[in-house]
Structures are given as structure tokens and as C-alpha cells.
Amino acid sequence: MVEELMKRFDVWLVMKEPNNSRVVDNLGLCTIVTPDELKDLPSILVAPMTTLSESLPSRIECHFDDAKGYIMVDQLRAIDKFCFIKKLGELESETQVKLCDCLQEFFAL
């Protein structure tokens, strides 16, 4: 079952809006930010990833799959589990720490 494989800091290819018929515009990379203890919920909290970004405190630079990109903490969203298509890997441990620090700052405001 897919949800058993889902863990915090995993990077997944997801369908962002299941009702959107434009498949190309609807797929994207996301990293899971939901704590593993809450993986039984029907949806998972994710932060989208992009290769294009402005310099914002809520954007974390990362390297994934030999490409430089950004995790967009300011674009958090809940995605239903059936929208997760394929696990692509996991964030590096240094990036995981930066993500946790950014989440703490983001919600402390």
C-alpha cells in the first residue's frame, strides 16, 4: 500500500488537483512535511518544489536528482493520498534540518 511507504521528507511526484484535466500542468514534485505519526490521516501536508524561485525566507534551497531547486514552505497544501503517484527519493539530512527550522519560524510568526 502506498501510504505505508510515505514518510516525512520523502519527495514524491503528485497530482496537485485531481479534477484538473490538464495533466502536464497538474503534476509536480512535493516533499512530505506531515510527521510520520500522522500518516494515517486521509491527506498529507506537503511543500511543493520548484526549480524557479525568488529569494524569499520561506524558500529553502535544495539539491535533488542532480538539480538545484527550492522547497516552497509558503505554499504548503494538503494532498489526498490517492494523488501521490511515485516516490522519487528523500531530502538530504542537511536540507531536512533547514526545512524543520523554516517551518518553526514560519508558524511562529
Role assignments for model-derived ranges:
Residues M1-L109:
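Conserved functional hotspots at enzyme active or ligand-binding sites that engage polyanionic ligands
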